[in-house]
Amino acid sequence: HQLEDVRDPGCLDHCDALILPGVGSFDPAMEKLHSSGMVEHLRSWHHNERPLLGICLGLQLLFESSEEGHTPGLGILKGHVQRLPEDQCERIPHMGWGQLRPQQPCPLLPDSETAPWVYFVHSYAAIPSKPSDLAATVAFGQDAATAMVWNKRTGACQFHPEKSAEAGARLLHHWIRWLESGAELPQ
């Protein structure tokens, strides 16, 4: 597999799959995507059902809006991003390990595996408008926060697979195997 750091929309033509990572804040990230000309290309990528994986802020950018800023999101997934509730027994930012609670079929989480523990660092969580887009949650106080979403060939995780040790590597391995097998839509 060949990896490429794509900073120009013209480079997308040569890609079979795309990872949208993100660290930082919603508005500056969206402004960077706008200034690089990537916004319409990312929307088209999803519309054409090409494989896309968002990570951390990359998950949040897929949604229509965020309480963290005023710039509209990509709108690839319907819903919004809101700050984690302050009234919980949890600290914000939510930092640490949490066990995924699968909600829907997703290529990253085979049914045969025990739900993994993964590492989170975030203060905001996505609220998908369509329940079918919610692939997994994680406990946050007495409630649950979105941990993974999946729609067609677009998926994303709020946690950091690269900081999640073997579990994170296994999730990325499942995504690569899914790509190699033809990126079939989840059943």
Regions inferred by a protein language model and the residue ranges of each:
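Structural motif
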Residues: 19-21, 156
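Cysteine-nucleophile active-site neighborhood
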Residues: 24-97
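Acyltransferase
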Residues: 154-187
